[in-house]
């Protein structure tokens, strides 16, 4: 192996980006098939293949960072910029949903009965399950910060406890959201209210599942001694993402659940 006289990571050719793109196409096509033809075969194939790509891509990144030492301070700086830009792009993604919601609700058209919520829509009570979900996500924000401080202080046992608690709260939120969807008196097909509500809260729910998965990988790595007090960017990125999910939920709760009802 040739001597490397710089601190940059020269990445080896990887099949995962193109395979990841193919599984994303399969999953989104499967979603369309499910919505229009009530068939989940393609969606299941897409999700399973995406899971396989995720596991193998994560394995490669873990090997490059933990075992080969490619994630030097210079590389970590680049990864931090990348994560910040990714979260910024996600913020603009949600901005589009909020824009659609306020565009429709601030000046309701005659088709909606000139009112918001539209005629015939019975909105969810913001002081019931949505308020509990808000408390759960805020509590998970506290526990993930507790885990972060425990890692930086070298207290591995406490970090494992805090991170496990965060993941359990994340899955509890997802279960409550699924229950709320099941019991809602309106659907995604019920006017622009149903469309904006389910698309915005559904995409947020998807982000909670992604964040919970990200934190689960971090927990497994923490158990296997992959993180040190000064080298744990994988966890840091997951924590940033989780705080972003928390903040988006607060905006969703205040606008769609509380003000929108």
From Swiss-Prot:
It is a multi-pass membrane protein. InterPro entries: Cyt_c/ubiquinol_Oxase_su3 (IPR024791), Cyt_c_oxase_su3_dom (IPR033945), Cyt_c_oxidase-like_su3 (IPR000298), Cyt_c_oxidase_su3-like_sf (IPR035973), Cyt_c_oxidase_su3_a-hlx (IPR013833). It is an enzyme of class 7 (translocase). Residues 1-15, 67-72, 153-155, 224-232 are mitochondrial matrix. Gene3D superfamilies: 1.10.287.70, Cytochrome c oxidase, subunit III, four-helix bundle. Residues 35-40, 106-128, 184-190, 257-261 are mitochondrial intermembrane. The chain crosses the membrane at residues 16-34, 41-66, 73-105, 129-152, 156-183, 191-223, 233-256. PROSITE patterns: COX3. It comes from the Eukaryota. It is found in: Mitochondrion inner membrane. Keywords: Membrane, Mitochondrion, Mitochondrion inner membrane, Translocase, Transmembrane, Transmembrane helix. GO terms for cellular component: mitochondrial inner membrane; respiratory chain complex IV. Its EC number is 7.1.1.9. GO terms for biological process: mitochondrial electron transport, cytochrome c to oxygen; respiratory chain complex IV assembly. Component of the cytochrome c oxidase (complex IV, CIV), a multisubunit enzyme composed of 14 subunits. The complex is composed of a catalytic core of 3 subunits MT-CO1, MT-CO2 and MT-CO3, encoded in the mitochondrial DNA, and 11 supernumerary subunits COX4I, COX5A, COX5B, COX6A, COX6B, COX6C, COX7A, COX7B, COX7C, COX8 and NDUFA4, which are encoded in the nuclear genome. Belongs to the cytochrome c oxidase subunit 3 family. Component of the cytochrome c oxidase, the last enzyme in the mitochondrial electron transport chain which drives oxidative phosphorylation. The respiratory chain contains 3 multisubunit complexes succinate dehydrogenase (complex II, CII), ubiquinol-cytochrome c oxidoreductase (cytochrome b-c1 complex, complex III, CIII) and cytochrome c oxidase (complex IV, CIV), that cooperate to transfer electrons derived from NADH and succinate to molecular oxygen, creating an electrochemical gradient over the inner membrane that drives transmembrane transport and the ATP synthase. PANTHER family: CYTOCHROME C OXIDASE SUBUNIT 3 (PTHR11403:SF7), CYTOCHROME C OXIDASE SUBUNIT III (PTHR11403). This is Cytochrome c oxidase subunit 3. The lineage of its organism: Eukaryota, Metazoa, Chordata, Craniata, Vertebrata. The gene is MT-CO3.
